[in-house]
């Protein structure tokens, strides 16, 4: 069993890399559907397909990228080559919102879809080796939670800042030019953060090098697919990813059509993300006290409760709704931290040579995340279409029917509550944490000498 403590000089840059990832996930997740329907006049179902189809393609590519990452590790001793390639996602991020003048409706949808396919592929080249890093390191059960705790705090800050900054940069009733300026500014921040993340990965590998994999390993995907614990964990996470991406896509609509002011999107994002930042260190302590699985189930139940309160709509009053969104944010922190720190546990328990399969496991995991990114906005767009929502351009004023307004509200609240209930049932099938949290020699899952250090707390390894 290992007692390695990861130094802050490595944890900081590694966590910083997730800011770039957070911008790519958050800004399109929060604004792309709205950008298509309310700026480019793309009908809701077509707009949903623009997000769905590229992400379906992405699902197929992620396991392949995972295999490439494992091959790089075996041949070169690191996964950084793909990460440098992935930094080019910044170009796709800018192009996504820099739609050529005159393109509206279906032609604009085609432009966005093509760029989104390229961007998702480049993003996976960075994301897959980045998230494989914890499994590559010679660290224990609690240190994995500590590592992902740092990462979770920083990515949540990145999501908060980008989610709040983007609406401020675009303003009220923005046009394509406003979105392009926003993409240029946030794209520059993406690039700086992602390069820092590569530095962090290098330092982590120096601090806790794992067992070098043997070249020619070819069983990672099959082992991952046959792993019952991994399947249970991934199925639940897929449902969570669908739910969270639906919520992100629905926020601008809920602010504009239910609360009456589009600018309240910034307030909702802040109310969601700020508690998530503050709650992450507490969830690290919860994981140490009662285990990751129990903490995750409690967070999922809290999310269901908060969604049901939001279903009351504007009649509940803005303070109550903001409080409910804050509950969702605190639950979101656990739903990011716990599963991502459980994946390396599963890999460690999968048998000898787990490091050589980490990219394959992570590729399948990020494929599930990409599926959630596709199905969440599409599910919300389907709700809008069923309610009779009418698309428009930025300079048009469209009055929505009562059915469309009901779809805006309940698609944002009751549908996520139902999906999260399904996620809870799937998550209960995961049982590895019972063994990991009570001690299991030979799996590298238990480390009695480890002290969990929260973000910002001094470490004797620095």
What are the residue ranges of the model-derived segments?
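Membrane-embedded alpha-helical bundles of multi-pass transporters/translocases
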Residues: 2-444, 453-454, 461-462
